[in-house]
A protein has these predicted regions:
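Conserved donor-binding loop and adjoining core beta-sheet/short helix segment
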Residues: 2-34, 39-50, 54-74, 149, ...
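Conserved acyl-CoA
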Residues: 47, 188-201
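A conserved beta-strand-loop-helix scaffold within acyl/acetyltransferase catalytic domains
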Residues: 52-62, 72-179, 219-220
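Conserved acetyl-CoA-binding loop-helix of GNAT-fold acetyltransferases
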Residues: 179-191
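Residue-level preference for non-acidic, small/hydrophobic
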Residues: 110, 187-190, 217
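Active-site/acyl-donor-binding loops of N-acyltransferases
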Residues: 58, 68-75, 201-237
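Nucleic-acid nuclease catalytic cores
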Residues: 166, 174-180, 199-201, 206-210
Length: 237
């Protein structure tokens, strides 16, 4: 089994940034031949890495540090008025955690979400292979949060369990349920689940000040950012 001392990393060639127009980005990847167990994955996450399928990566741009890893210390979180409304609005839904896997039911929801919400992104068009390589392959202690309206699957969130927290990987929802704010609801549920499991953190990936679609992450307070190798509460002013 690999460890931090023996890991080999690779950097991609510069490519167009997916988040900030006109910028070039470089990504650092863990050697895909490395054997990454839950303990090593947890260490990598605390250093700002993310998982996408069987790949572990973090931004490694020469002249830009806009991508900031963020996490929430769940025991300090108190929902604001808007988040309490989201919880109340979705109190009729059922949530359950199941082992991450491919099913046509999951893929149907995923494909509708990508086609109707992200047709201008690099995940379009969706495919079964894409779903599997992104959300199922490489899983260590990986789960899907099913969000159900009676028997209808209306939301699906990929969640990894780490040594000290949960990592929110990706969430999709039924486009016709947009008014339910299921993305926010999924995060609120994961916060509650982390508390129930007596875990300290919910990792929310990267926050980019110039990317409006990531603004929602800073609505969960107090949020911590990894800067200069140290996690610290993010100053919102």
């Amino acid at each position: 089994m690999s460890n931090l001392r023996t890991l080999v990393f690779f950097a991609t060639p510069a490519h167009d940034c997916s988040y900030i127009p006109g910028r070039q980005a470089t990504t650092m990847f863990v050697d895909p031949r490395a054997q990454v167990d839950k303990r090593l994955y947890s260490q990598l996450t605390s250093l700002g890495f993310r998982r996408s399928g069987s790949h572990y990566y973090r931004p490694h741009c020469e002249h830009c540090n806009a991508c900031v890893p963020v996490r929430l210390k769940v025991e300090d979180f108190m929902p604001d008025r808007s988040q309490r409304r989201v919880l109340k609005k979705n109190s009729d839904l059922t949530c359950r955690m199941v082992t991450a896997s491919f099913t046509e039911r999951y893929y149907d929801l995923y494909s509708r979400y990508i086609e109707q919400r992200h047709s201008d992104g690099d995940m379009y068009p969706p495919s079964r292979e894409q779903f599997t390589s992104f959300l199922v392959e490489g899983a260590t202690d990986s789960w899907f949060l099913e969000i159900l309206d009676q028997d209808q699957l209306v939301g699906l969130a990929a969640v990894d369990k780490l040594d000290e927290g949960l990592s929110a990987i990706y969430t999709v929802f039924e486009p016709s349920y947009e008014h339910r704010s299921l993305g926010t609801f999924a995060i609120l549920w994961q916060i509650e689940e982390a508390n129930r499991l007596e875990l300290s953190y919910l990792y929310l990936g990267y926050w980019i000040a110039e990317c409006r679609k990531m603004n929602y992450k800073t609505r969960f307070q107090p949020i911590e950012a990894l800067r200069d190798g140290h996690w610290q509460v993010m100053d919102q002013h």
